[in-house]
Each structure stands twice: as structure tokens, then as C-alpha cells.
Amino acid sequence: MSESGFFLDAVGLSVGDIVALTGATPRDGADLSRAISDLAPLDRAGIADLSFIAETKYAGVLAATQAGAVLTTERFAHLAPESVAVLRIAKPYEAFVAVARRLYPSALRPTSLFGTLGVAPGAVVHPSAKLAAGVTVDPGAVIGPRAEIGKGSLIGANAVIGPHVKIGADCAIGAGCTVTHSEIGDRVIVHPGSQIGQDGFGYISSANGHTKVPQIGRVVIHDDVEIGAGSNIDRGGMRDTVIGQGTKIDNLCQIGHNCVIGRHCIIVAQSGLSGSVTVEDFAVLGARTGVIPHITIGKGAMLASRSTVYSNVPAGAVWGGFPAQSKRQWMREVVALRQLAARDHDGRTAASAEAAAPSSDATGVDQPDQAAS
């Protein structure tokens, strides 16, 4: 449910529009002309709201909802009140997201403070910089010599784009970001306060102290990457730091120099990758994952929250713990330790220790929550 004023470009849809957009099947007698202007959870929805149900635990809430329309599987369709336009579909949450994207396009990326195209008063653009058609530069932003900004991109307030940086089309660089020594593809989103292209953490240590190693690589970010607020991506030492197409990096993450992250990876908040780490395609790193230098995380591997990785992770593996290891072995060790800790002075073991083992889904990746939709 949106608070009024934050998303001024919100558009309305009819139930019929939602059917056409999602391919859902309406219940007999559903009013396809009913106007839907907002989204809301089942227990807060009104006649102009769309909601959804995907889990059994919300069946009772569905039976009492006042929503104008509900996306649901066939399993729950009969529970909705007669006043609700029931839209049956195999994957209701995915359909709900499709509608949300249509209703609230400005919620998909950072937007201009003033919502106007062009260079705002107070922004500084070097005469040699190249700005394509439809670029927006908000107040306080600075764009350096020979930088190139692609068609339709946004440079937020107080962002700094360094010399020779290339940013593709339809990108959004949020307020307060710094981008240097980088080449960025199309449709890349960088949320406020992130820093990209600063020098990597490279030193030679001796008895006399620490001598800085010049970092002469770049950061290369491919199309459709999203980087959360307050994250940092260091440029490479003698090769590039690379973020592959479609990868999503959460808030407050650190990507060290020379890292190569593949396509469509997920890196959840507060994770840190040391230098020269390779993360292969479709890998998932749960919140607060830490990885030491020169490690490879295989294609499709998953790391539970707070994993600390000291060795290569095989493709498709599910690991967790400190040090990270296979989920099966990690859980056995946790159970064994808890059994030992629970023994009383007579040596008895608490039978419930195994029930306290970690959840099998401990990545920290958000899952759809009916009550918070």
C-alpha cells in the first residue's frame, strides 16, 4: 500500500487490464470493469486494491478480505468472498509483481528530485562530457571531463561521475554516489551513497610500514545490474573488477579489487568479497557472507547467512557456517555441539537439540510475505 505523494506517476488499471497483463482466469461473474488503483495485503485491502495469496496460513485472512481483486491459485479461490474479483493463476506472487511494476513504474529505480529532464541549476558538467538525449542531472551533481552518459539516464543529486567514465542508456545513479574508473552498461541501477571505482586495498607490508600498490584497473558493470545503497566496488589492480549481467547486490556490500562476479548472482546485505574472488553465474551469497581472497564460488552455489568461506565452493553446492562447509556437515556439527552443551552433570543429553538445527533456507534472501505485500 503506497502512501500518497511518494509515487506521483502511479497509474490505475481495471480488473480486465490485470487479466490481460497476467493471463489470470477470472471467476465467473467477476466485474472486469472494476478500477484497481493500489496494492495492499489481504487484511488491509479495500475495494480499489489488488492483493494476492500464495500460502495456506493466510487462508483465513482471504475469507474476510475486502479487496477489490485477489490473485490466487485454484486451491484458495473458493475461500474469497463473493464481492471479490478472484483471478486464478498458477503463480500469484509473480503476477502480483507484474501488476505492481505497471502501477508504480517510478518505484523501480531512483528518480529525479524535480522530475524534469536536462541539467538542473547547481549541477556542474564539464564541457567535454557527452550527455545523450533525455539525460537528467540533478542539483549538486558533477560530471567530469570526457565522461559519457547514455540516453535517458539519471545522475542524482550530489553524485560525482569521474573523468572518462562511461554510463549506458536508461541507468540511474542515485544521490551521493561516486563513480570513477568505470564502464557501466545499460539499465544499471546504483542506489544512493554507493561508491564505484575507488582504488582497491593493495599494499606491500614490511618492517617500515605499508607501501601502497597502484590500482590501474577498472570496474566493468554489465547490463541490468542493481547495486544497493552504501555499497562499494573497488577497481582492479592490473585487471578489471567485473559485475556480470543481471546480478543484484544488496545494501552495504564490499566487492574487492579484481573480483569477477558472473551473471544473475545475488549478494545479500553486508557481504564482503576480498580481492580476486570469482563468483560464477547464478550463485547466491546470504547476508553477511565473507570470502577470503582468490576463492571461486561455483555456478549456482548457495551460501547461508554469515558464512565465512575459506575454500572453493563447488558448483550447485549449498554451504554454511564458520568455516563454510556443506550444509549437511554444518548441521551435523551444530547438532553435536548443542547436544554436548545441553548435557547436565549426570551426562544426560537434551533430546531436543536436533530440533534447534539451522533452517534449510538460511540465505537471508527475502521471500514473499503475504502480510507485508
Curated annotation (Swiss-Prot):
It comes from the Bacteria. One of its GO terms (cellular component) is membrane. Keywords: Acyltransferase, Lipid A biosynthesis, Lipid biosynthesis, Lipid metabolism, Repeat, Transferase. InterPro entries: Hexapep, Hexapep_transf_CS, LpxD, Trimer_LpxA-like_sf, UDP_GlcNAc_AcTrfase_non-rep. Disulfide bonds: none annotated. It catalyses: a UDP-3-O-[(3R)-3-hydroxyacyl]-alpha-D-glucosamine + a (3R)-hydroxyacyl-[ACP] = a UDP-2-N,3-O-bis[(3R)-3-hydroxyacyl]-alpha-D-glucosamine + holo-[ACP] + H(+). Pathway: Bacterial outer membrane biogenesis; LPS lipid A biosynthesis. Residues 350-362 have a biased composition (Low complexity). Homotrimer. This is UDP-3-O-acylglucosamine N-acyltransferase 2.
